[in-house]
């Protein structure tokens, strides 16, 4: 186990993306922060953060919460005024 120091941060994220992340965190019994840290650490190493069963659950959550954005949309989103 590695001992770390966490800081509180505020970030803005698309509404349905957040709903899916929160639903997934609950499903995996993780805090939202732990889930995001895990995703980022995997991405930094070029590794996939999820296996097939979790990806299936993500697909279900995307459908439930109407998340239509994909990786192709990243860094191209325009916020409503």
Where are these regions (language model features)?
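Short, basic amphipathic alpha-helical segments that act as recognition/interaction helices
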Residues: 28-55, 67
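Short Lys/Arg-rich basic patches
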Residues: 1-15, 22-25, 62-72, 76-81
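A generic alpha-helix surface/boundary motif
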Residues: 18-19, 34
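Residue-level signal for well-ordered alpha-helical scaffold segments within enzymatic catalytic domains
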Residues: 20-23, 38
């Amino acid at each position: 186990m590695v001992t770390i120091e966490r800081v509180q941060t505020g970030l803005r994220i698309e509404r349905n993306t957040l709903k899916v992340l929160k639903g997934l965190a609950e499903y995996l019994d993780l805090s939202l922060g732990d889930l995001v840290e895990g995703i980022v650490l995997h991405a930094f190493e070029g590794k996939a953060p999820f296996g097939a069963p979790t990806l299936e659950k993500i697909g279900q959550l995307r459908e439930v919460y109407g998340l239509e954005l994909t990786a192709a949309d990243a860094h191209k989103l325009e916020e409503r005024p």
